[in-house]
Amino acid sequence: MLSAENNELVCRVGRGTPMGDLMRQYWIPALPSDEFPTPDCPPKRMMLLGERLVMFRDSQGRMGALEEFCPHRGASLYFGRNEEGGLRCAYHGWKFDITGKCLDTPTEQPERREKFCANIKARAYPCHEVNHMVWVYLGPRDAPPPFPAFEINTLPPDHVAHPRIMMEEANWLQNMEGDLDSAHLDWVHRRLHEDSPKPEKGIRGFWNPTGRPPVLDVVPTDYGAYYSAKRMLKDGNEWHRVNQFIFPFHTMITVGDGTVNLRSFVPLDDDHAMLISHAGHPARPLSNSEVMEQYGDLFQQVGGFIERTNDPRTYFMTKANKRNDYGRDMKLQSELMFVGIPFVGNLQDRAMTELMTNDAGEAMYDRTKEHLSASDAMIVTVRRQLINAAAKLRDEGTVPPNVDNVELDRVRCASLRYPPNADWKALSETARRVIPGQPSAAEVGLII
């Protein structure tokens, strides 16, 4: 349970809000590289933390992100021409490069254009492109902080799969909290029987070998927190799923196949967030065809994505969504799965979180109404960390350690088997570190 004040603080992400200002200290993943296939290709609208942007790849292949509205009289730069090293506004022809520098103001007389341009600048945000993803820095520093050193960002490009993205119609926090809550695996993601076959749509549901709920042990860190969700195996050993939270909105959730991953819950505004799932293999190339062979084209199994509009909040929106009960199939529910929503990406989770609203109808739950339990220990810890970090930035100007010390981001999740009462923290220390060239620790799969 949170106070109304702290709930507002931790959820709102617009410019000038404590949490929004905290997130702006970090590089933020925005759109996949293949949204911008060639130099001078058409620009794309984007929204991050409530700010409307236009992103484009210039003539040299460099990525840029500008405030959508031209500093002349506010026309949308989205309609501009991307050519010859910059984006030219369709309204009056003013032109800007990726740094926001004004290159031309053709409505001014030729003899005064150079001097006039020197006093005009579009609001521009630095971009960094790595491993099929474009990241943007929205923060206040003239020189951005170091780029995040997540393992997924440092692998060779052919070891990293194309990011899988799903739009979520709820506040970023209630979306992300599903990754901090291991107990829900035993319910919304479970199959009905241990030997239940894989459904026609989605992946096979989760199975808890003994049926006992997990016991959580949470460890706060300088970069966020990690936790073990301990379940008992039939042979009497303990199964520890060790997952990560990294400031400001990233998680790592073990899947037990030797790959490494990063899940980023990126707020577009207070009611919409993208779940960007990055996956790679430390030891060998990982092709997109291999990913499709392993997981299937899951989004297509539930109809694919809706047709995009001019609103970025429609990007990566599955056709199965809250307007059609997420493709709920009662035959699936009666025969194979505890819930009749296909286990595709975060579709089942979205059915739980997107309908959590406050009295104003926003998809931002009123957490004063909650009744938390021991299984919510990681959620409680991370909320406290986020609130404290946002308050320290607001009141003291202190940024979290991993803004500048990006080596703190060099962590992994793991799925491990230990004898009863083992010291899981000590035993998992190596598994939780990035060891270049070695697969992630997966002594126990996800049992799906």
Task: Describe these PLM feature segments.
Residues 56, 66, 90, 105, ...:
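Beta-strand residues in well-ordered beta-sheet regions across diverse protein folds
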Residues 91-102, 125:
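Hydrophobic or amphipathic alpha-helical targeting/insertion segments
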Residues 100-117:
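Glycine-rich loop(s) and the adjacent beta-strand/alpha-helix scaffold that form part
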Residues 72, 92, 184:
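Histidine-centered divalent metal-coordination motifs
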Residues 37-38, 62, 135, 141-448:
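C-terminal catalytic domain of Rieske-type non-heme iron oxygenases
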Residues 71, 87-90, 103, 128:
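Cys/His/Pro-rich metal-binding microdomains
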Residues 1-83, 113-139, 143:
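N-terminal pre-ligand scaffold of iron-sulfur
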Residues 81-86, 100-104:
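Short cysteine/histidine-rich zinc-coordinating motifs and their immediately flanking basic loops
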